[in-house]
Regions:
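Short beta->alpha connector loops at strand-helix junctions that form conserved
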Residues: 53, 74, 101, 127-128, ...
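Structured adenosyl-cofactor binding patch, chiefly the S-adenosyl-L-methionine
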Residues: 12, 140-145, 203-244
């Protein structure tokens, strides 16, 4: 389960011992020396910091003695992008990576990790900010896939795409206005980019992609759930790879 660490000393030691802290919650207006020290550690580790009212901290606290700070620690350890590339290399396969642009719903993230595993993707990449991390809900929804599928967390998704392009990976972005997926070549080293539940892939990330693709739809509404879209596109990649 996601671990909540409460109290100033405990939170500070969590950072200093190298625990992966997803979010740090600090009491609104709390600016004394120990809290500033904790906030510095959070910035050093690129942890999301949220200032919240006392009522929020009290409702999150299990001990009733949070001292104005609570840290949310990831339920699972994160991998690195290099770990994902190494997995592809070890399997002798062209890399297949799913990148998620600001997915906020833990059920969607868990479902996408499950899909990634079943589709043979070598890993999933998520951003550090404005996105859900590896919570207990994500782990449960993944139905065990999180134990086998590397998930890397990066500070800048666009920059990561640029770096992976230098390694020969092409990037396709899910977009309603893209070319129908059956008409595109989705074989070879590929990164599939799936966007936020409400807004899709952000403009800056979309501009980094080599092309856009769409799932053909014939219904009365205009969009799929993020995890469903990821599944449809991921298994089109599987189909094309198997047909080669």
């Amino acid at each position: 389960m996601t671990e909540m660490i409460e109290g100033r000393n405990a939170v500070l030691e969590a950072f200093r011992s190298g625990k992966c802290v997803d979010k740090l919650f600090i009491l609104d207006g709390c600016q004394d020396g120990p809290v500033r020290t904790i906030a510095r550690e959070a910035r050093k580790h690129d942890t999301i910091v949220k200032f919240v009212p006392k009522e929020r901290l009290d409702s999150m606290s299990e001990t009733g003695a949070h001292q104005g700070v609570i840290a949310q620690v990831a339920a699972y350890d994160y991998s690195t992008v290099e770990d994902i590339l190494k997995k592809a290399e070890e399997k002798g396969e062209p890399p297949f990576i799913i990148l998620l642009d600001n997915i906020e719903d833990p059920h969607n993230l868990g479902a996408i990790i499950r899909t990634a595993n079943l589709a043979g993707a070598h890993g999933v990449i998520i951003p550090k900010h404005r996105a859900v991390g590896l919570t207990a809900t994500v782990a449960k929804t993944s139905a065990g896939a999180l134990n086998y599928t590397p998930v890397a967390k990066v500070a800048n998704l666009g920059q990561t795409i640029d770096e992976l392009k230098e390694k020969g990976i092409w990037f396709v972005c899910a977009d309603m206005d893209g070319e129908v997926m059956y008409r595109q070549n989705l074989t070879g080293p590929i990164g599939l980019v799936i966007g936020n539940e409400g807004n899709g892939v952000s403009r800056l990330v979309k501009e980094k992609c080599d092309f856009t693709t769409a799932i053909p739809m014939n219904g009365d509404i205009d969009s799929l759930n993020a995890s469903v879209a990821a599944g449809g596109l991921a298994f089109e990649i599987v189909r094309q790879r198997m047909a080669k």
